[in-house]
């Protein structure tokens, strides 16, 4: 910004370091200038990625939206959003911001003296299906421990399966969740909160319609999984839908008949 006023003022909307350049010109048109680098320094508040002066739940939602590619944070926003100081932006950062908002954490950044290990095993089960069926594909977690943040990618073949509903499960009750269908057959999700008092539960339940022309097999995959700030798992879990002829009518007889039981086990002479 520039001004020709003798007394000027300017409001800086974003944190950072700003140079000031002063140019003086006399009545004969002769001018001279001086540059004062980083003269104005607007401080940052850890966790305040929205630049509104406070760290709050809205900032946590912006972190999650960045992780699922709904929004893109600037390098400076990523730096101050990294409240765990691990040099990355993660669902755990969003969890710490939420915990700070409700008073569970006294200050940001937050680097606990003892870091609790976080883990969990993800499970999916194979199933049989045929065209026209609706199938439920739950993704569960077992042996969960200190899962305060979770992100992943769900993929499936949209030429075979049409997504009917996606419902996040009871394990994520109370979590802040963001999701984004980045393209047909691909969904990113990220969740932050405090793990409930359970080691097992449903993360998400997907309901698909099996499209016409399905005669082989198709898979649904949970990939790029990261719990808190653990190393990312390339494949968290995977299931296969196999074609099974007539499965929708299995176990439902169309014709009933009653025949003589011979020989009768209770009276062998009966015919």
Where are the regions a protein language model picked out?
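A structural signal for beta-strand boundary/capping segments at domain termini and interdomain linkers
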Residues: 3, 29-33
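Acidic, low-complexity intrinsically disordered segments
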Residues: 44-45, 50, 95-260
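Acidic, divalent-cation-chelating loop motifs in proteins
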Residues: 45-50, 78-86
């Amino acid at each position: 910004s520039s001004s020709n006023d003798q007394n000027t003022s300017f409001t800086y909307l974003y944190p950072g370091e700003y140079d000031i350049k002063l140019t003086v010109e006399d009545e004969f048109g002769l001018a001279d200038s001086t540059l004062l680098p980083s003269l104005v320094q607007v401080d940052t508040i850890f966790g305040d990625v929205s630049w509104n002066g406070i760290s709050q739940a809205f900032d946590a939602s912006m972190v999650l939206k960045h992780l699922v590619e709904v929004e893109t944070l600037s390098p400076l926003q990523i730096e101050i959003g990294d409240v765990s100081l691990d040099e990355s932006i993660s669902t755990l950062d969003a969890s710490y911001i939420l915990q700070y908002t409700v008073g569970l954490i006294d200050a940001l950044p937050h680097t606990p003296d003892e870091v609790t290990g976080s883990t969990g095993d993800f499970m999916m089960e194979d199933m049989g299906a045929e065209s026209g069926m609706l199938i439920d594909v739950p993704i569960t977690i077992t042996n969960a421990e200190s899962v305060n943040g979770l992100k992943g990618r769900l993929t499936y073949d949209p030429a075979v399966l049409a997504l009917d509903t996606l419902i996040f499960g009871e394990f994520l009750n109370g979590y802040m969740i963001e999701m984004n269908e980045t393209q047909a057959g691909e969904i990113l999700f990220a969740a932050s909160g405090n793990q409930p008092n359970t080691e097992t539960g449903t993360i998400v339940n997907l309901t698909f319609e099996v499209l016409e022309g399905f005669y082989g097999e198709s898979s649904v995959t949970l990939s790029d999984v990261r719990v808190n700030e653990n190393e990312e798992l390339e494949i968290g879990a995977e299931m296969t839908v196999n074609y099974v002829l007539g499965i929708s009518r299995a176990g439902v007889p169309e014709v009933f008949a009653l025949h003589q039981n011979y020989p009768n086990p209770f009276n062998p002479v009966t015919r």
